[in-house]
Amino acid sequence: MKKFLTAITAVFAVTLMLAFHIPAKAAAADTLELKSKAAYVADYRSGEVIYSKNEDERLPIASMTKIMLLNLCFDKLDEGEFTLNDDITVSKTASGMGGSQVFLESDKRYKASELLKSIIVASANDASVAMAERLYGSESACVDEMNSKAKEWGLNNTLFSNCTGLPKPTQYSSAKDVSVMLSRLIAHKEYFNYSKIWTDEIDHGDRKTEITNTNKLVRFYEGCDGGKTGYTAESGFCLAGTAQRGNMRLIAVVIKGENSKSRFADVSSAFNYGFEHYTCKSALDSSKELAITVKVEKGVKKNVTMRPETDIYVFAEKNKRGDVSIDFNPAEKIKAPIKAGDKVGELIVYRDGVEIGRTNAISAENISRKTYFDYIRDVASNWTF
């Protein structure tokens, strides 16, 4: 059994090496240089870095702070702590917040969806505090959870003092840490229902407040569908953005740009460079069955078809050659009955001999256990007369 599986694995690996060989092209002459004080550009799926500059330096990040707040909000939404249709009463404290706001009225109720939209599209401080108070009882309790989450994620250059990003000497983060926060946020698909909005309005009942997305790239850069701006005198002009074209999704963060135009120019340049110089191809597709099967003991079928549990993509420079191989490690004992979705092994993807991802190999079908009568039928089918 072991020898048989080893042979299958070898064939499987060679096949994929041929299929995903990255073609060599003439090296591009242009390079990426960003003007902002700190920057970090990476592939979303693999986390591979395309460009970095002072990425670990602790700097004020202004309203990009709200990225962590939004992570908490969508976590709570997923956990059922609240629904988008919930009414949330705005406190006097929340309605009195300075800076960017949508002019929420004290003691008035707003749908949770309206508050999230206000934070994501308009960077509203009043809506931010209203959500923090609804979920944690107070802004300070929310900030404690934000810092706890930062520690959990290994964001060693991040410390929060409020949930809005308003200036505080004890509040900072880094370009690299912000990229992690944004990567976590966009894993919540509900987020994109708001982040792609260009213009909308907030309904106060007797009046409406028109809002426009502070992230201009949502409208003016093809593929940009999310992100967060920030500005204070201390932080300079900041932007964390994400864009997708084909299989490739990029994350770009810049801190302390010279002006509003320069931050958008920097992130646009980062996206352009990434999409032009890199490629992202599917190595394992969870919707497709694998080209190999594995023997099943005591099953009505001798072999089980498999598929990857999750997708794995290969991210690489277009002008560099690279080989991709996949190893399959079967489970120790694969016995019927088997249900579709049961783990039957593990798949490990390598690029140039370095592991870049792994996922379970799961059964793509149900296989029942042989009965006594199945064995009798098998014996009978082998009789000769």
Task: Give the label of every model feature segment.
Residues 15-16, 79, 282-285:
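Residues in and immediately flanking transmembrane alpha helices
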Residues 12, 24-26, 286, 290-292:
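Intrinsically disordered, low-complexity repeat and linker tracts
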Residues 1-5, 61, 112, 369-372:
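Structural motif marking the loop-to-transmembrane transition
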Residues 2-25:
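Sec-dependent N-terminal signal peptides of Gram-positive bacterial secreted proteins and lipoproteins
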Residues 155-159, 167-172, 176-385:
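Domain-terminus/edge residues, biased toward the C-terminal soluble/receptor-binding domains
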Residues 20-176, 180-189, 201:
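Active-site-adjacent loops and short helices of periplasmic peptidoglycan-processing enzymes
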Residues 3-4, 67, 245:
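Hydrophobic alpha-helical segments, especially transmembrane helices
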